Amino acid sequence: MRLRNIPGAEAALREYPTFVDNPLFYKGNWKERFGNNNPIHVEIGCGKGRFINTLAERHPDINFIAVELKAEVVLRAVQRTEYKAIPNLAFVQYDASKLTELFADHEISRIYLNFSDPWPKTRHAKRRLTYKSFLNTYRQVLVADGELHMKTDNENLFEFSLNQFAAERFQMRNITFDLHQSKLAADNVMTEYEERFSSRGQRIYRVEASCVIK
């Protein structure tokens, strides 16, 4: 579903304390933004913001950053914060293909990919967030034992991703082809999209992958 254009969205974002207007300033120094040395977890694509907000509330000892390209999407997500300054949560409007401009080498402990665009046409494979070029970027910004957690409702994207992880020497675990019927469901935080589609009987696929520093 296409999100309608919201006039003035970029200006409106600056009214929210969780939005970071100058993210490049913090590259290598996100600890200054959060005021601590806690691990950093990044969600690429934030949807309506439920997932990242819930994690921030449950884990005050972890810093969370949502990276999203479209201002309208970020605005909808930050509105969940109701203008509150949540100390361990930040939203950034930026292109995820340029993560190395936002983060220094090995600055992130975990990356979340939730229901990313599957780009089903073969000629668009390079745009998939689990394509090898993206995985190499993740490896660069993740710590040595950093993790990538992926969820999708698209079986073809999931199988493609598993193959990419294997080819790029990511170590996989907790692979499930039906998340909500697995033991992993108990600790699962659902996105709005996930809740809607799983309620219709759609299976959710999930995997955790750890990078090996080359």
From Swiss-Prot:
Keyword field contains Methyltransferase: yes
Physiological role: Catalyzes the formation of N(7)-methylguanine at position 46 (m7G46) in tRNA.
Annotated pathway: tRNA modification; N(7)-methylguanine-tRNA biosynthesis
Single GO MF descriptor: tRNA (guanine(46)-N7)-methyltransferase activity
Keywords from the named record: Methyltransferase, S-adenosyl-L-methionine, Transferase, tRNA processing
Cited InterPro entries: SAM-dependent_MTases_sf, tRNA_(Gua-N-7)_MeTrfase_Trmb, tRNA_methyltr_TrmB_bact
Binding of S-adenosyl-L-methionine, residues: E43, E68, D95, D117
Family: Belongs to the class I-like SAM-binding methyltransferase superfamily. TrmB family.
Classification via Pfam families: Methyltransf_4
Transmembrane segments: none
Gene3D superfamilies: Vaccinia Virus protein VP39 (3.40.50.150)
Binding site for substrate: K121, D153, T191, E192, Y193, E194
Name of the featured protein: tRNA (guanine-N(7)-)-methyltransferase
Recorded GO CC terms: tRNA methyltransferase complex
Catalysis performed (reactions): guanosine(46) in tRNA + S-adenosyl-L-methionine = N(7)-methylguanosine(46) in tRNA + S-adenosyl-L-homocysteine
Domain of life: Bacteria
First-level EC class: transferase
EC number assigned by the record: 2.1.1.33
Catalytic residues (positions): D117
